[in-house]
Amino acid sequence: MTTHPPADQQQGHAETAGGVLPAPTGWPAPPGPAAYHGLLGEIVRRLEPETEADPVAILAQLLVAFGAAVGRGAYFQVEATRHHPHEFLLLVGESSRARKGTAWDHVRRLISDADPTISQRILTGLSSGEGVVWAVRDGAGSDPGISDRRLLAVEPEFASVLKSTNREISTLSPTLRSAWDGRPLQLLTRTSPARSSDAHIALIGHITQPDLRHHLTALELANGLANRFLLICCRRTRLLPEGGASDPLHGTGLTAVLAGAIRHARTAGRVHLHEQARELWHHAYHQLATRPGAGIAGALCARAEAHTIRLALLYALADGERQIKPEHLAAALALWDYAERSATWALDGATGDPLAEQIHAQLLNHPGGLTRSQISDALQHNQPAHAIQCALDALTLAGRATRTRRPTAGRPAELWSATPEPVA
């Protein structure tokens, strides 16, 4: 017997084949509806039923790309610090299956249609601070420099960037920290000195949870690079075997509205809090500044106030406003709350110790457990005993490894095993 879907389900692939996927057990609760505010929220709602990508991945990347296109013509001032509309974002999800790249493809096409000039300023390949400065350098002597010093760096394999920042002589980490702060960048080499006085740099990175836990070191947590990123977990949210509509925004006029918002925001200048938003911000600021943060996830969320006000600025500019209103703060707080939940989920039990993460990976590959001697063998005898002990202690403290004793003909042998991971 042949059955047919109802007539109202025969109108497009999203309705006929699209099955919404439930969130895995333990997955962070999604952002509140307030996060999908205004123009950007409307764009995401139009795209959502036509893609397997997580709507929050589209929203977060769209916010960052929008701010990159706007440039330094708008800012919110806190004492002597100017917060321009540029952010660093790290999407965390399974390789290929989380549809991080799919979400970015939608955003890239949209932002390029709204502002064709930004296309040439979307770059990949972060490997050194020198390369970053050179891409946004001022003119000097016979070198005309780069006239458009906006830069949107997109790194689909962000683990390689974290590896680069951990090299002993790497200048990438301090350069990125200064870029997020909006400070002048300088390259002090004898052969090719360069300076960027007013760069506007935004960054989008994609990484898996295991790679994040493995490569995020205590050093990057201590020096502040990690907490300059907004961390957002994303997943595949539906199944569309034949994909959704090729251009879900066609005929909506939303791309033109976005283009107008970008042009308007470029001359916004100093953006203030609307009078009705001040009380909300004062209350939220106190909550964010005094909220206890434990472990690596807490360290990653240490710049909550700065991220929240930058997000509020982005929402306001996307609305064509030159004041931050209560709805913009509410949207920013909803997205920041999700970022905190994402950090807790992604980094629960992380050690910040690369050796500990390396040993943990070996333990996962050997469900029967490993002795100390076997652990040393797996590490090719490149680590001293005291370093291995410190790493095992860190894994034990994080609840990710357990020690048992196995009887032998002589002294009992220690057997180390990975603690079963909670289902995520």
Predicted feature locations:
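Phosphate-handling catalytic cores of nucleic-acid transaction enzymes
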Residues: T2-A424
